[in-house]
Amino acid sequence: VTISGLGGEPDYDQRFKMWAEDIDSSLKRAGGDANVITLTAPTREQIRARFAEVSRQAKPDDALVLMLIGHGTYDGTEYKYNIPGPDMTGTELAALLDRIPATRQLVVNMSSSSGGSIPSLQKKNRIVITATKTGTEKNATVFARYWAEALRDPAADTDKNDSVSALEAFHFAQRKTTEFFDSAKRLATEHPVIEDTGKGEGERTPSTENGEGKLASAFTVVRLGANA
């Protein structure tokens, strides 16, 4: 499920929609038995209705991927994802995810302030990737652009097994995000992190030492080439 939220102005609306469509086409091109759903600027009711549908169809041995593109806010306590009408809180998103029987879940929150959603979203067997380390990194993000790229660029497949794992996509998009700020000679306003232990804070450098990344390394997001 890919959602592009409210841009607030035409430039962002277009950008968010374009990134979501890029992801959508990569997933559909990969084929397989994936059920690809893409929502553009949906309301809370539309998101809930789609999740109810997924909940009815999903089985425990399925894998669920939720990708959020757009703007988010964080008031020091609660993260909110910006959509038309009332925004959706991290707690509400977590409740929707909890109702889906798929045991393995990946949430990629690519909005501004997305780091603030980690405490609400983290759970055993759920990988959480966010564009920002904390809720206070509130500038518009570029991570989604490079996450979309990771799902179609063979360079992201570092172990050359014709598929891109959540960890490989994270590393690729993280590196490209850093390069974006470096080449523009700008101070980085987003620091992507990953959390897949169900506890603790997001890590910028997942390793065996901090225990992060193990689940993500075994989670295939997309298959490339002949094996698709």
Language model segments and positions:
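Cysteine endopeptidase catalytic domains of the caspase/legumain-like
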Residues: 1-228
